[in-house]
């Protein structure tokens, strides 16, 4: 396809118009008095949201050059969302401010590469200053609640639920968000290790009212192959039957003669027994069986390791305080594994999480980690309508990610104050030349933008409040919700340091690319050729 080539000011101005179009749509959502954005869809009802990245993702501009600018800032929002889970609006506002200030200087003759070097130096200094400002959250339930409430757009109910979930499962635990059947929003915590495999036969059920299998202090046999014949199982079944304890078999599958004999023995009351398929597939199944073995103090019976069912002894079986199984899930509570061995396994999984590049693998490793170290909490989000449900679920997701970020890297004063305080660190920063010094000044002015936007969304003059907050020190800032100047940390207005850091780094990265752009290539849309050839007339004599 033919390309239209734009150079210099024409290229950069087009990109800036796109940046402004997207940023202006996104920034109306910032702060406690930020407004909603309603997004029309070509099918279904409209979506109402206050989530910056949801707004950014929907924006496509008609002009191809402007659209390139918008897409670059969209990248800021989505990358910030991927890395920190929140702060997408802050990142967009910062990117717009850096681009605006930077292009003014480029138009006045500054060298774009020197400006970019100055911007990068300033960002590095601010990030170091944020690290000094950060305070550790640990397991402080109040701080977790405050962060979650702010990220959920000042919804204290959501904040409280997330704090409850964190208190129950700890920072290693997994918290997932699901849609509730009714209008109530609540937390459901699963104790112990749960995996998504139910009983292989309903005849194993011990509680007909709940249709569940409940086994107290059972032995647990872990086998990585299929069990089809009863003969294989007899060396295990006989000593277990003599002990009088129940038995749970977790294997690749149990079928044929083996399954039917187990069911008959269960119904006759000769054995308390149940069988489930092993969770996962392939290598992940082997790893999860090993996790269960470590948790329960058992051994995986695997021919790869030289073990067979025929030579399995009762000492090789795992133990747990309780096991409950329904048609979809198996939950093992209080496994008898040794704490040190479990801890080593947890550290091994953490190491794998750090080295893997796949988001999917990372998610699965996090789930395994939670099942071993913490637990699993499900946050059920309820609402009166589908539109409200989607909007609320977005906010809960944001709050959850922000809380994780806070636990990971600590917290700083919210409401744009932490960035404003970091300006002081730029005063001593040395530049190699005048344009680099200008780049540092660009960042110094741009980091006022989040506070300015929060104030303007609250209906006040941004410059006045920014000047007043700048006069103060420490955590002194402006509470837009109550229209007061307060100590931000004491008032519970806090941001995760990771969110602030990632927002600034991503904004500076994309802004630098726009400032150093000298040429833009755009597809030229081909004019539609006329319609096809007209239909010929019919043959003579035809109607």
Curated annotation (Swiss-Prot):
KW Magnesium (keyword) present: no
Compartments reported by the entry: Cytoplasm
EC number: 5.6.1.7
Binding residues for ATP: 29-32, 50, 86-90, 415, 495
Catalytic reactions on record: ATP + H2O + a folded polypeptide = ADP + phosphate + an unfolded polypeptide
GO molecular function annotations of the record: ATP binding; ATP-dependent protein folding chaperone; isomerase activity; unfolded protein binding
Keywords: ATP-binding, Chaperone, Cytoplasm, Isomerase, Nucleotide-binding
Annotated Gene Ontology cellular component terms: cytoplasm
Gene3D superfamilies reported in the protein's UniProt record: GroEL, GroEL-like equatorial domain, TCP-1-like chaperonin intermediate domain
CDD domains to which the protein is assigned, alphabetical: GroEL
Pfam families: Cpn60_TCP1 (PF00118)
InterPro entries, A to Z: Chaperonin_Cpn60_CS, Cpn60/GroEL, Cpn60/GroEL/TCP-1, GroEL-like_apical_dom_sf, GROEL-like_equatorial_sf, TCP-1-like_intermed_sf
Transmembrane segments: none
GO biological process: protein refolding
Subunit structure, as described in the record: Forms a cylinder of 14 subunits composed of two heptameric rings stacked back-to-back. Interacts with the co-chaperonin GroES.
Family: Belongs to the chaperonin (HSP60) family.
Protein task: Together with its co-chaperonin GroES, plays an essential role in assisting protein folding. The GroEL-GroES system forms a nano-cage that allows encapsulation of the non-native substrate proteins and provides a physical environment optimized to promote and accelerate protein folding.
Official protein name in the record: Chaperonin GroEL
Native organism: Flavobacterium johnsoniae (strain ATCC 17061 / DSM 2064 / JCM 8514 / BCRC 14874 / CCUG 350202 / NBRC 14942 / NCIMB 11054 / UW101) (Cytophaga johnsonae)
Gene name in the database record: groEL
């Amino acid at each position: 396809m033919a390309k239209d080539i734009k150079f210099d000011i024409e290229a950069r101005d087009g990109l800036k118009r796109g940046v402004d179009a997207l940023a202006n749509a996104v920034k109306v959502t910032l702060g406690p008095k930020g407004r909603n954005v309603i997004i029309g869809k070509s099918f279904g009802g409209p979506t109402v949201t206050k989530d910056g990245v949801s707004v950014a993702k929907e924006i496509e501009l008609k002009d191809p050059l402007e659209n390139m600018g918008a897409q670059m800032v969209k990248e800021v929002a989505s990358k910030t969302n991927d890395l920190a889970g929140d702060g997408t609006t802050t990142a967009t506002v910062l990117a717009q401010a850096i681009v605006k200030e930077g292009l003014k200087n480029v138009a006045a003759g500054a060298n774009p590469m020197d400006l970019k070097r100055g911007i990068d130096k300033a960002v590095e200094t601010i990030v170091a200053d944020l690290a000094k400002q950060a305070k550790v959250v640990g397991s402080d339930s109040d701080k977790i609640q405050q962060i979650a409430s702010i990220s959920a757009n000042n919804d204290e109910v959501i904040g409280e639920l997330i704090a409850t979930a964190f208190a129950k499962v700890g920072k290693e635990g997994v918290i997932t968000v699901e849609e509730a059947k009714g209008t109530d929003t609540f937390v459901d915590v699963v104790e112990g290790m749960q995996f998504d495999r139910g009983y292989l036969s309903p005849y194993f059920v011990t509680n007909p009212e709940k249709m569940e299998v409940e086994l107290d202090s059972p032995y647990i046999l872990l086998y990585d192959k299929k069990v089809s014949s009863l003969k294989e199982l007899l060396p295990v079944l006989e000593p277990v039957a003599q002990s009088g304890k129940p038995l749970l078999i977790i294997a690749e599958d149990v079928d044929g003669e083996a399954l039917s004999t187990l069911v008959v023995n269960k119904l006759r009351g000769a054995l308390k027994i149940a069988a489930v398929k092993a969770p996962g597939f392939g290598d992940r199944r082997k790893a999860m069986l090993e996790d269960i073995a470590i948790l329960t103090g058992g051994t995986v019976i695997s021919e790869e390791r030289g073990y067979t069912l025929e030579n399995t002894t009762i000492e090789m079986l795992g133990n747990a305080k309780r096991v409950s199984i329904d048609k979809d899930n198996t939950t093992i509570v209080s496994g008898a594994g040794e704490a040190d061995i479990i801890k080593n396994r947890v550290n091994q999984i953490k190491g794998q999480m750090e080295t893997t590049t796949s988001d999917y693998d990372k998610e699965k490793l996090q789930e395994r980690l939670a099942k071993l170290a913490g637990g699993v909490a499900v946050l059920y989000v309820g609402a009166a309508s589908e539109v409200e449900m989607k909007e609320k679920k977005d906010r809960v997701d944001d709050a959850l990610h922000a809380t994780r970020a806070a636990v990971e890297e600590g917290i700083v004063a919210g409401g744009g104050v932490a960035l404003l305080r970091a300006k002081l660190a730029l005063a001593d920063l040395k530049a190699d030349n005048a344009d680099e010094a200008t780049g540092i000044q660009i960042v110094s002015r741009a980091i006022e933008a989040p506070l300015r936007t929060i104030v303007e969304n609250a209906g006040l003059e941004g410059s006045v409040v920014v000047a007043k907050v700048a006069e103060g020190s420490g955590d002194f800032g402006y509470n837009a919700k109550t229209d007061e100047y307060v100590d931000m940390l004491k008032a519970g207005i806090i941001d995760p340091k990771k969110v602030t850091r990632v927002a600034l780094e991503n904004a500076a990265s994309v802004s630098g690319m726009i400032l150093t752009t000298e040429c833009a290539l755009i597809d030229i849309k081909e004019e539609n050729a006329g319609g096809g050839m007209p239909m010929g007339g019919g043959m003579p004599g035809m109607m």
